[in-house]
Structures are given as C-alpha cells and as structure tokens.
Amino acid sequence: MKFQGSQNYVATEDLMLAVNASATLRKPLLVKGEPGTGKTMLAEEVAEALKLPLLQWHIKSTTKAQQGLYEYDAVSRLRDSQLGDEKVKDIHNYILKGVLWQAFTADQPVALLIDEIDKADIEFPNDLLREIDRMEFYCYETRELIKAKHRPLVFITSNNEKELPDAFLRRCFFHYIKFPDAETMKKIVDVHFPGLKKELLAAAMKTFYDVRNLPGLKKKPSTSELLDWLKLLVAEDISLDVLQSQDNKVSVPPLVGALLKNEQDVTLFEKLVFMQRQNR
C-alpha cells in the first residue's frame, strides 16, 4: 500500500514520496521542520489512510531509551514477595511493556511514532540503534528475544533542538517539511475552514506572512497558530473592515495573541502596522 495523501492532511508530492520511500527501504522516516508544520499529524494521517493502528511515544527531556522497550518493576515484586502474593512466581507480572515491545509483538502491522526525539539527551538515539535497525531486543529478566512479528512503519520527528548522531541518521530516510508557501497554505486552511470568505482569508494570510517576514522576530508563528487565529476570527465574527482597520487607536489587528507570543514581537508588529498605515 502507498500513501497518497488524505482528506484531512495536505501532503506535498515530495512528502508522499518520502513516506513511500521509507516504507520501501524498510527504514524509519525521520521528519524535521518548524514546530507546527504537521510532523506529528503526518504519522496519524498515514496510519489512518493505510488502516494501521498507531502507537505513539512522545519523548521528554527525561525519557530514556529503555522505557520504549520495557521496565522491570522490582519494587512491586519485592513488596508482593513480602506480602506472600502468588504473583511473584511469574516475573512477567512485573514487566511493563514499552511502545516498541507493543509494536514488535502486535498481531498486525502498525505505525509507530517516536515524537520529538531531539528532546531527549544526546545518547538516546544511539541507545535505540540496534533495536530499530534489527527490529529486536532481549529482555534479560524473562530471558526472551522480542522480535518484530511485522516490521512497523516508523515515524521519527525532530524540531532540530539538537543534532542527531550520524550513525542514527544513516539508518533513517530523511525528509524536511518546508514551511508552506501561500498556495499550499490556502489548501491547508480550506481543509479546516472550507466556507471562509475569500476576502477575509486573503487579508488574514497577508497579515500572517507579514508577521513571519518581520526582521528580528523572536518566534515566527506556525501553521497551527494561523489556524488558531482563523478559528478565533470566525468564532468572534470579525469582519474584513475590522481586520483591515486604519484606526490609529487600534495598534494591531484583533486576536493576534494567537500568532505572537511575546511582547517584543508584538512591538515589532505594531511598528510594521504603523508604517503600513503611514504609506497609504
């Protein structure tokens, strides 16, 4: 089966090729891109389109690779032993299966998302090299070799917070999701707001890209933040006249708190709006 996009996700041709290439090579798809460009949603939509169950592992700064395999609950076993619980006779009762164990032992092919791998420490990717490459690992407590019944379709996302090791990169197919151009962005918006008035959308899009192109901006607004802003404009029934107001008492368009997340960026945008009004 090949991924050919979905009704809920605007996938470019090169992104669809990347998904299918990773499946052909039987390698994880490593997806990078700005926050909010749909990296996590890609795995969800591919899984739904290909009718695969999706297992998700969201990485934090404290996450260890072993947690993705399994954890042995020695404390509970010791407590149960002291209480004379019959469960202690079977060590399997104290093995907490991680997401890789679940994916490897699933009775049908699954999609596996390892989300924001760059949040973990630098050794995290290296600690998963063998397991992801060979699709197996050993559980020492139960003396079992856990081997994948069906090779999962693996998605790994990164926000580029830190560089990933070369040895890990060699085992992946890489794709960078570029920030959508205006035409692609309109298609994305149309999926979420099919009835949005063209004039309002055009004005909102101009404002959005004006903000993103501001020199010195600390945090550029993402696709997801544009969608949040449009949702608010629709919910509050903001008219085109209000959005394009020339009233000097109003320093910025309404509800830009969905786009700008610190006071320095708001100040920059206020200056841009002021200069645009002066030039009209």
Residue ranges and their predicted role:
Residues M1-R280:
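C-terminal regulatory/interaction module of P-loop NTP-utilizing enzymes
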